[in-house]
């Protein structure tokens, strides 16, 4: 089965060689990583961000790049765009391939949803954040972010 990735429509693009993850039972997961806003992208600069996943069912930290280990087994929704990345970003307010995805056809959600959310009220999603040499997968309900 081809893994279907849907880019999150965020104002930033993840571009990182380092991911820092902090997990607590009571406060979910906080990720610190490097991103680029459109102006950063134009100037080849980066800024730190913290993404906070509030209700978390599962966290997976894998020390391999997602695209390397799945090189012929994934598809990114919307990758058939034909306009310039900057033009797209300016027009729609988000990067067409943010590096932050939902896995649309998640085997984990299919197999564990009844365990993690038996009442079906958490609206769990399978998120993927790819780093340079690693990636993180998170089963969570929602997230918020702030620049540091």
Segment roles from a protein language model:
Residues 1-148:
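Surface-exposed, interaction-prone regions used to assemble/regulate multi-protein complexes
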């Amino acid at each position: 089965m081809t893994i279907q990735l849907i880019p999150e429509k965020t104002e930033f693009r993840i571009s990182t060689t380092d991911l820092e993850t902090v997990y607590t039972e009571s406060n979910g997961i906080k990720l610190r990583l490097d991103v680029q806003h459109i102006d950063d992208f134009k100037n080849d600069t980066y800024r730190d961000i913290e993404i906070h996943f509030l209700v978390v069912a599962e966290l997976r930290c894998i020390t391999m790049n997602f695209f390397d280990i799945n090189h012929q087994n994934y598809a990114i929704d919307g990758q058939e765009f034909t306009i310039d990345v900057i033009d797209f970003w300016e027009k729609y307010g988000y990067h067409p391939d943010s590096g932050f995805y939902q896995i649309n056809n998640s085997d984990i959600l299919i197999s564990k949803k009844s365990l993690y959310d038996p009442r079906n009220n958490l609206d769990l999603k399978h998120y993927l954040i790819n780093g340079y040499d690693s990636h993180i997968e998170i089963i969570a309900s929602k997230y918020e972010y702030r620049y540091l």
